[in-house]
């Protein structure tokens, strides 16, 4: 296997997936606000439910997809996740009601296993002393996607609030097609594990953390960081529009700066 080429594809995959997510951040709250009749308070509560549903589906389904990647390999899980996200964004682009838009976020949470599987892929193909640097590069890709994504989403959302969803769909589907031809499998058959439901559920994953105290501490830190991080996209767009009258473009450019800072830290500090 050409490790450099494989890591380059994983870098591009993470960048495109986060870009596809980022382009929606400036416009999805606006769509919810429209469905709620312009009531900012109700829209904020509903968008919070959107974010909760997405996170809950990830919590429930990520262990399952992780166990499937241990059994069948990383490649099919990554490609199916990219394909599923692309189809989901098309569904959200044409959703005529708030209910169907909510269903779209649930589907997105179910299929959003690309990032975690990408980290498993990196662990498969890099030596232990090089993993911190490789993980740092993936973190930089994450930040890069959040630089370009919100900026594009804000600019396109000013033209049509549905347009960023079509761009997200195109990015994910193109990435899935590209990966079909260039992404090799990283987990050889002799290293694969039998599928077991005790590992393929959130409770099993939490039991694993409990048995490894260093991992438990890191997981607690990551949980706190993500709680703080998820507050920003959940309320910032609506708050900035209500308090300061910011447009989708202004919000998108502001969040792009946040993504730039994240990419800088991940790329230069980690590893």
Model-derived features with residue positions:
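Helix-loop-helix hairpin linking two adjacent transmembrane segments in secondary transporters
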Residues: 141-181
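Cytoplasmic helix-loop-helix junction between adjacent transmembrane helices
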Residues: 104-143
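Hydrophobic core of transmembrane alpha-helices in multi-pass small-molecule transporters
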Residues: 15, 88, 99-113
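Conserved MFS/SLC helix-loop-helix module at the cytosolic interface between two early adjacent transmembrane helices
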Residues: 59-98
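Short amphipathic helix-loop junctions that connect adjacent transmembrane helices
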Residues: 27-44, 234-250
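Central cavity-lining transmembrane alpha-helices of secondary-active solute carriers
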Residues: 49-65, 256-267
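Juxtamembrane intracellular "pre-TM" segments in multi-pass secondary transporters
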Residues: 184-221
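Pair of pore-lining "gating" transmembrane helices in MFS-fold secondary transporters
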Residues: 3-30, 34, 212-232
């Amino acid at each position: 296997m050409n490790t450099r080429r494989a890591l380059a594809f994983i870098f591009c995959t993470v960048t495109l997936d986060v870009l596809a997510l980022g382009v929606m951040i400036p416009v999805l709250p606006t769509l919810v606000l429209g469905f709620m009749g312009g009531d900012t308070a109700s829209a904020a509560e509903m968008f919070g439910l959107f974010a909760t549903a997405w996170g809950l589906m990830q919590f429930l389904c990520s262990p399952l997809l992780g166990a499937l990647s241990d059994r069948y390999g990383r490649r099919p899980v990554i490609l199916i996740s990219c394909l599923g996200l692309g189809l989901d964004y098309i569904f959200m682009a044409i959703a005529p009601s708030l209910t169907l838009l909510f269903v779209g976020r649930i589907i997105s949470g179910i299929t959003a296993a690309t990032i975690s599987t990408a980290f498993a892929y990196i662990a498969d193909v890099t030596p232990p002393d090089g993993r911190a640097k490789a993980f740092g590069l993936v973190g930089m890709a994450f930040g890069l996607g959040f630089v370009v994504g919100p900026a594009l989403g804000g600019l396109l959302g000013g033209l049509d609030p549905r347009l960023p969803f079509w761009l997200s769909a195109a990015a994910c589907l193109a990435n899935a097609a590209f990966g079909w031809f260039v992404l090799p499998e990283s987990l050889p058959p002799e290293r694969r594990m039998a599928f077991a439901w005790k590992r393929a559920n959130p409770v099993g994953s939490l039991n694993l953390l409990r048995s490894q105290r260093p991992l438990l501490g890191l997981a607690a830190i990551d949980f706190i960081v993500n709680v703080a991080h998820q507050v920003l996209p959940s309320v910032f767009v609506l708050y900035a529009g209500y308090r300061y009258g910011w447009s989708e473009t202004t919000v998108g450019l502001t969040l792009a700066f946040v993504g730039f800072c994240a990419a800088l830290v991940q790329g230069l500090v980690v590893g």
